[in-house]
């Protein structure tokens, strides 16, 4: 088979709860206005006016929306009920940071694969709105993020890795500020080392953010004249710090004709990201969003040509109209014709043998929304099992419709932490949504951390990860009786981490993640295959040949087999990061994207592109799942979460410095 087929279920950290819309704030009247329509999430906008003070309004914006299942660029105009799709890169499932200037649309896309692993896919493109011709402005082999166009449109700035590979960082990216003429994108100048999210003031001043040596994210400034010849010897320049320590400042937007910049801030004693205006002349801040919406996060400001309006995106709120529920399951665009992609409002999906239901974990805190959830595969009805217990990772018995195996206890803890494998038997035929269950624990309480159960295709055995020896290795037990009556057999043994196993539908192999090639590094994992009898262990090489620096940088988890046993599905760090993580809410591992590959490592194909962490994938037990329109009115009786904008700021941004 040249390409895999089937339905993939997965989760995206935080994404279902964003509810982003684009807003503008009139600085004269302090009136806030929503510019987008409340469908899907809408973000990373820019005003689409002509670029001079006489056109200083907020009537048109270009922005990114995921309303078609992937990020694409749209134009919203006052008085029009629907936004207009703008040109996109053919085959691209990721567009970001659009700018409309002088008849050209600039945007980031990630549709062209680099020629090596751990090189980002993001690059800058432009589209002529008249002829719709798409041009790549980033040199092949280079990676660019976060473009900005100067006031006249003559110059472009980007945050760029150049041709350097991604170094594995995902808090502050090691990008430089690069400038080039719009008329000649091949002649690029590094004007400042170390920085991101550039913004122009005129044609000769660029502001950008950077994490300073004292630990505070701050705004920096460089001023220069672009060389008329090819003598770039005076570059890069030493930038001037603009914002003071004591407050985090990110994602600046220069206000034309002044020394002011709009910035997103995080302050001591404050839980929310807000937009403020910083006056570099008086060195003072003016808060603009906190007085209006003190308990909402606000992201990525942008400014109108005459500086009257400041825009941003935030959770739309519960009173503005638009989508107000979180779909249990929603479709996502797929790059492979034979694969259906479905995002789940939860983690660790596992489908029933007949394909009618999906088991998952909604939350990993028992008091919040723990236990095991079950939802119909069409996204409608939902049930809760073991409601007040912490559970994670599920495996539906392939031979019993009403039996699920799960892990009960805290997730991602030490080998000695008590976590147990449980067999849950239940009946969904009654009217109750909180379903009474028969829970049978299959592992002894004194055996430490037992988790990630996977059932054999005949339903007789479970393979799982256990820390009972002091290391996390794989074991096999009887699926009905566990280790109490059925005994237990150790499958792998060593001072490393073997985890997240998956049993082949052909019953001949078990796939798992392991750092056994480098046991001293708990951040790198590769895929391994082993037979159920313990023979035939081999590593699946994806990033490079055995012993290469690239292959030992792999962080690959949550591997599982396709329905025919010919393909592996997993989440990996092979493509770096797609957008600047500091511009988003919290993502634990923003490099996490979904891939498929054959069992020998060939045929590697990427499935997702965005600035989020995508993970815990699983193949649905049926080829295709029928869903209704995710943006239509919620059907009566559907059990879905209310959209409340419940997400966190990046946990690695601390004000305790």
Please report, for each region that a protein language model flagged, where it lies by residue:
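Sequence signature of WD/YWTD-type beta-propeller architectures
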Residues: 1-657
């Amino acid at each position: 088979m040249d390409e895999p087929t089937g339905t993939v279920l997965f989760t995206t950290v935080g994404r279902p709860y964003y509810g982003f819309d684009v807003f503008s704030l009139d600085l004269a009247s302090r009136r806030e206005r929503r510019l987008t329509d409340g469908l899907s999430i809408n973000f990373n906008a820019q005003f689409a006016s002509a670029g001079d003070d006489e056109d200083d309004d907020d009537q048109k914006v270009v922005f990114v929306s995921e309303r078609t299942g992937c990020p694409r660029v749209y134009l919203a105009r006052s008085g029009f009920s629907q936004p207009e799709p703008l040109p996109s890169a053919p085959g691209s499932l990721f567009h970001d940071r659009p700018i409309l200037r002088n008849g050209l649309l600039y945007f980031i896309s990630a549709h062209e694969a680099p020629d090596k692993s751990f090189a980002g896919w993001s690059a800058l493109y432009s589209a002529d709105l008249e002829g719709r011709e798409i041009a790549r402005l980033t040199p092949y082999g280079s990676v660019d993020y976060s473009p900005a166009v100067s006031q006249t449109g003559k110059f472009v700035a980007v945050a760029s890795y150049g041709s350097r590979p991604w170094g594995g960082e995902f808090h502050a990216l090691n990008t430089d500020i690069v400038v080039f003429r719009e008329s000649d994108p091949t002649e690029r100048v590094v004007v400042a080392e170390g920085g991101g999210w550039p913004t122009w003031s005129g044609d000769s001043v660029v502001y950008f953010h950077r994490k300073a040596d004292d630990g505070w994210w701050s705004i920096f400034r460089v001023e220069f004249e672009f060389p008329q010849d090819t003598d770039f010897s005076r570059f890069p320049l030493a930038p001037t710090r603009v914002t003071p320590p004591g407050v985090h400042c990110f994602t600046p937007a220069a206000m034309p004709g002044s020394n002011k910049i709009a910035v997103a801030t995080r302050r001591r004693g404050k839980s929310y990201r807000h937009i403020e205006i910083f006056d570099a002349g008086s060195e003072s801040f003016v808060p603009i969003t906190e007085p209006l919406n003190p308990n909402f996060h606000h992201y990525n400001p942008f400014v109108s040509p005459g500086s009257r309006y400041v825009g941003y995106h935030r959770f739309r709120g519960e009173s503005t109209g638009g989508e107000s529920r979180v779909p249990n399951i929603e479709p996502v665009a797929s790059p492979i014709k034979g694969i259906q992609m479905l995002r789940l409002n939860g983690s660790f999906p596992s489908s029933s043998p007949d394909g009618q239901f999906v088991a998952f974990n909604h939350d990993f805190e028992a008091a919040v929304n723990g236990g095991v959830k079950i939802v119909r595969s069409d996204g409608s009805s939902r049930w809760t099992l073991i409601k007040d217990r912490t559970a994670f990772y599920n495996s539906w018995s392939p031979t019993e419709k009403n039996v699920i195996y799960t892990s009960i206890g805290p997730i991602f803890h030490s080998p000695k932490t008590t976590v147990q494998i449980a067999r849950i038997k239940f009946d969904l035929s009654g009217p109750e949504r909180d379903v009474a269950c028969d829970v049978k624990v299959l592992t002894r309480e004194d055996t430490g951390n037992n988790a990630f159960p996977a059932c054999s295709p005949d339903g007789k055995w479970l393979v799982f990860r256990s820390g009972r020896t002091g290391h996390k290795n794989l074991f096999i037990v009887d699926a009905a009786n566990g280790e109490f009556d059925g005994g237990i057999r150790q499958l792998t043994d060593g001072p490393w981490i073997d985890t997240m196993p998956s049993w082949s539908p052909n019953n001949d192999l078990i796939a798992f993640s392991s750092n056994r090639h480098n046991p001293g590094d708990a951040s790198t994992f590769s895929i391994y295959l082993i037979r159920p009898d313990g023979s035939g262990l081999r590593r699946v090489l994806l990033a490079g040949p055995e012993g290469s620096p690239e292959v030992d940088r792999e962080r690959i988890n949550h591997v599982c087999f396709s329905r025919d046993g010919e393909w592996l599905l997993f989440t990996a760090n092979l493509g770096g990061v797609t957008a600047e993580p500091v511009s988003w809410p919290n993502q634990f591992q923003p490099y996490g994207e979904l891939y498929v590959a054959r069992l020998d490592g060939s045929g590697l194909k990427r499935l997702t592109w965005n600035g989020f962490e995508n993970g815990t994938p699983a193949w649905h037990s049926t080829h295709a799942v029928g869903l209704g329109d995710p943006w239509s009115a919620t059907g009566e009786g559907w059990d879905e979460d209310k959209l409340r904008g419940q997400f966190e700021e990046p946990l690695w941004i601390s004000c305790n410095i």
